[in-house]
A protein has these predicted regions:
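Glycine-rich, charged/polar anion/phosphate-binding loops
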Residues: 42-45, 94-97, 145-149
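Catalytic P-loop NTPase motifs of RecA-like helicase/translocase cores
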Residues: 28-29
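Conserved hydrophobic/aromatic beta-strand scaffold that supports enzyme active sites
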Residues: 40, 55-59, 161-163
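Solvent-exposed alpha-helices and their adjacent loops that cap or buttress functional pockets
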Residues: 12-15, 32-36, 48-52, 154
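Conserved PLP-binding catalytic core of the aspartate aminotransferase-like
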Residues: 148-172
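Active-site phosphate-binding strand-loop segment of PLP-dependent enzymes
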Residues: 1-25, 40
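Active-site C-terminal subdomain of aminotransferase-like
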Residues: 46-139
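Conserved active-site segment immediately N-terminal to the catalytic lysine
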Residues: 21, 35-46
Length: 172
């Protein structure tokens, strides 16, 4: 990690031809995401809300589903990645089909984390909490005589994957 984030989705054209892929592992639930411009978005349970690290989540936009239905690669696809059958999108993995046996403790852990998010005020409250944590750390860094953010640009500094560096003269 480098301690940075993309600050907004303004750079993604609304009339783009291709698909926009987003690894939102450190952003899901803790940052506002431009969902209307993201076609394939992934994250895992362990980030932001805490929890089990071995399981991933996938969100596909209607554009991504269209691509699945209109494009068939000339190479064999592993079963795990087959999301279309006979030119039609297969929603099996989005409606309960098991790809990999998930521990029910892991599922319960994720559900418990979602209940906590709801109890705290939902996703907007978690985004605010994450930004407040970054602000508290920024205040500390601002008063430190040795710590600096690895990402100097405030607009791209991540509130979840924070990286600090030693900036003291004696260290460099």
């Amino acid at each position: 990690t480098s301690g940075v984030r993309v600050p907004h989705g303004d750079w993604i054209p609304a009339d783009r031809e291709g698909l926009t892929f987003c690894d939102a592992t450190s952003a899901a639930f803790a940052m506002e995401l431009p969902w209307e411009k993201l076609d394939v978005t992934t994250w895992s349970w362990q980030k932001v809300m805490g929890g089990e690290a071995a399981h991933g989540m996938l969100v596909l936009s209607p554009r991504a589903v269209e691509r699945l239905e209109s494009y068939s690669p000339p190479w064999p696809m592993p079963k795990l990645f087959r999301m279309a059958k006979g030119g039609k999108f297969s929603a099996d993995i989005f409606s309960g089909a098991t790809i990999n046996t998930v521990s029910m403790l892991c599922v319960e852990d994720a559900l418990d984390a979602l209940k906590w998010v709801e109890q705290e005020g939902g996703q907007p409250a978690i985004v605010q909490r994450s930004e407040a944590n970054l602000s508290a750390l920024a205040n500390w860094v601002g008063n430190s005589d040795w710590a600096e953010f690895l990402a100097p640009d405030v607009s791209t500094r991540s509130c979840t994957s924070i990286c600090l560096t030693i900036g003291a003269d004696w260290f460099t």
